[in-house]
Curated annotation (Swiss-Prot):
Keywords: Hydrolase
Family assignment from sequence similarity: Belongs to the ADP-ribosylglycohydrolase family.
GO MF: hydrolase activity
InterPro entries: ADP-ribosylglycohydrolase (IPR050792), Ribosyl_crysJ1 (IPR005502), Ribosyl_crysJ1_sf (IPR036705)
Name of this protein: Uncharacterized protein AF_1724
Cytoplasm listed as a keyword: no
Domain of life the protein comes from: Archaea
Record-listed E.C. numbers: 3.2.2.-
Length: 305
């Protein structure tokens, strides 16, 4: 089980770093500039080097460290940590909804009112630690995913996206089959956003089609209605970690978030991450230590319950 924690956290960061240089590009642009992205590349804007990750991984770390401090998820602690991170980060890629919500928090707005009514994917991209630590109770995973989303995002698709990703990760740690995992995800997401649930279902149905077809049908914008289904498409379409991540990255659009989410879900299933990606990943040892701490916290919680 500890390996699944490790591969989930590292998988998220690997996907983020792979998608970073092509974030915002169309499939056609990616092909013209790079052919097919299969390895880490530097940002064309000069802000990040090959193997470095973006705010997707940074916010995941913020959430993980909050959980490690509070044991059970505390939205007030998470909100305070988001404020601190926002002041300290050098990232120039923070999404519009997160930026506005954290700005609200910094102006003294309580976390219950600071969130922005938006369907962007900031809550889904960072939620992995919740699916890992609390996988012993899918109801708790769903509840914490929802609350963690509301700190910055209050749109139904944004919340549903966070629930989908967290529940998928928890199910994979629990060794659910892909069919059982999908059924559990859909059942819970339907309570938040029917369209998102239908698109995730469809993502599985078209997983034998190519990436161009998937992007045409599902989209690749920053909306959770696009990012989360595309991440599930990539998950189901690849026979292993590498194939899924290459599909996710080369989908373009919000490629780093699509690939980060796909990498987290795929890693939680236990798929091995190619060593060449791990060797080039920024702060690999820090992320491995973070995963170990999350696993140890999970074990302590289980012993107490």
């Amino acid at each position: 089980m500890e390996e699944k924690f490790r591969n989930c956290i590292l998988g998220l960061a690997v996907g983020d770093a792979l998608g970073m240089p092509v974030e915002g590009l169309s499939i056609e642009n990616i092909r013209q500039l790079y052919g097919e992205v299969r390895d880490f590349l530097p940002s064309p804007y000069g802000d990040l080097n090959a193997g470095e990750w973006t705010d997707d991984t940074e916010q995941m770390v913020v959430l993980a460290e909050s959980i490690l401090e509070t044991v059970y998820f505390d939205p007030e602690n998470f909100a305070e940590r988001l404020k601190r991170w926002f002041l300290e980060t050098n990232s120039r890629r923070i999404g519009p909804s997160s930026t506005k919500a954290i700005s609200n928090l910094m102006r003294g707005v309580h976390w219950t009112r600071a969130g922005v009514f938006s369907d962007t994917c900031g809550a889904a991209m960072r939620v992995a630690p919740i699916g890992l630590v609390y996988h012993f109770s899918l109801n708790l995973v769903e509840r914490y995913a929802e609350i963690s989303a509301r700190v910055t995002h209050t749109g139904t698709a944004a919340i549903g996206g966070a629930v989908a990703v967290a529940v998928a990760i928890a199910c994979n740690v629990l060794d659910f089959s892909d069919e059982e995992m999908l059924e559990e995800v859909l059942r819970r997401v339907e309570a938040y956003d029917n369209l998102l649930a239908e698109k995730i279902r469809y993502a599985n149905e078209i997983s034998d089609r190519d990436v161009e077809y998937a992007v045409e049908k599902l989209g690749n914008s920053i909306s959770s209605l696009d990012v989360v289904p595309m991440a599930f498409y990539s998950y189901f379409a690849g026979k292993d970690f590498e194939e899924s991540l290459i599909k996710a990255v080369n989908a373009g659009g919000d490629a780093d978030s699509i690939a980060a989410i796909c990498g987290a879900i795929k890693g939680a299933k236990g798929f091995a991450i190619p060593e060449r990606w791990l060797e080039g990943l920024k702060d690999r040892e820090f992320l491995e230590e973070l995963a170990t701490k999350l696993y140890e916290l999970h074990m302590r919680i289980v012993k107490l319950t």
